[in-house]
């Protein structure tokens, strides 16, 4: 299965991609949380794409998106967050608390992610780029 053809998204520095599982109960919730960030940086005119897939497609799609050099959040055992910055540097942040501090510092926005929002065993990932 060629994920590249199926995805058909024009990736660019003005693009944010959110990847969620269709069978994940928090897909909509994750999207809403990231939308809060977008609301605060809407002057940057960032395009948003939401991609949902079933678990069987999830790893392949995630690997494809990672090759696009986008920032990546993986909420599995312990969150490891990679933020692709405008400069091209990839910043590694080790927890949701650190991610929240980063957002507060960069965008002066205090109501973004609360760690308890993601306390469950469901595998889920968000992929995004902050410019």
PLM feature segments, named:
Residues 14, 77, 88:
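Short coil/turn segments at beta-strand junctions that form active-site/ligand-binding loops
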Residues 17-19, 49, 80-83, 91-92:
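Beta-strand cores of modular interaction/reader domains in eukaryotic scaffold and signaling proteins
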Residues 83-119:
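Non-catalytic, surface beta->alpha helical segment in thiol-disulfide oxidoreductase systems
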Residues 1-16, 114-131:
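Eukaryotic N-terminal low-complexity, Ser/Thr- and Lys/Arg-rich leader segments
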Residues 26-30, 57, 77, 92-99:
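Alpha-helical interaction elements in eukaryotic regulators
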Residues 22-29, 88, 123-129:
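Short acidic, S/G/P-rich loop/turn micro-motifs used as interaction or catalytic elements
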Residues 50-77, 84-85, 103-109:
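Thioredoxin-like thiol-disulfide oxidoreductase module
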Residues 2-56:
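Local sequence-structure signature of Cys/Sec-based thiol-disulfide redox active-site neighborhoods
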């Amino acid at each position: 299965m060629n994920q590249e053809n199926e995805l058909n998204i024009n990736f660019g520095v003005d693009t944010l991609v959110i990847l969620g599982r269709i069978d994940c109960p928090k897909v909509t919730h994750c999207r809403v949380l990231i939308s809060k960030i977008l609301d605060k940086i809407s002057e940057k005119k960032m395009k948003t794409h939401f991609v949902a897939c079933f678990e069987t497609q999830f790893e392949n799609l995630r690997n494809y998106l990672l090759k696009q050099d986008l920032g990546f959040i993986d909420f599995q055992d312990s969150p490891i967050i990679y933020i692709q910055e405008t400069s091209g540097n990839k910043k590694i942040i080790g927890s949701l608390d650190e991610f929240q501090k980063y957002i507060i510092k960069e965008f002066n926005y205090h109501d973004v992610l609360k760690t308890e929002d993601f306390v469950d065993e469901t595998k889920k990932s968000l992929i995004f780029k902050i410019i």
